[in-house]
């Protein structure tokens, strides 16, 4: 069970965005997504809405940050089935156990058109300041498991190492020196 109060507290009081430092899930992802020329993009758990204005036709939702276009969580988001060409979930499917992750992915997949892409980022652990949070421990085994379970094609996986900029960010506070970034593709209906 995900403790929403602990999660909200962590994001409001401890977490700071470091997306500008990320090689595979920061500005470079903008180019990758824009090259697909998507008609509709959902940023699931958009936090500070970093991609807004950089990726056309993007709507971001988040339960904590007011910069979101819609303030809600995964299960309250108002999207219709198979409406999105691309979904970005960079750290928003990192909570709870395997069943919790499966439920979140089922919901997110329901919005993705056949042939659409889901860009994800997950870590094999959390922060020193994340009291009360249950992190899902992502690794290659888990990434492949959910590809099979959700009937996704796994297009690519990259390892993104934690670096720090002049602002320091929260990366020095992480237990693990890296995270995974990957792309699932929803299979076409035959």
Placement of each model-derived feature along the sequence:
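Class I (Rossmann-like) S-adenosyl-L-methionine-dependent methyltransferase catalytic domain
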Residues: 1-78, 117-190
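A short acidic, Gly/Pro-enriched loop at the edge of an enzyme's catalytic core
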Residues: 75-87
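A short SAM/SAH-binding and catalytic strip from SAM-dependent methyltransferases
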Residues: 86-99
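Non-membrane alpha-helical structural segments and their capping/turn regions in soluble enzymes
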Residues: 98-102, 137
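A short glycine-rich, Lys/Arg-flanked "PGG" loop and its adjoining helix->strand segment in the class I
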Residues: 102-114
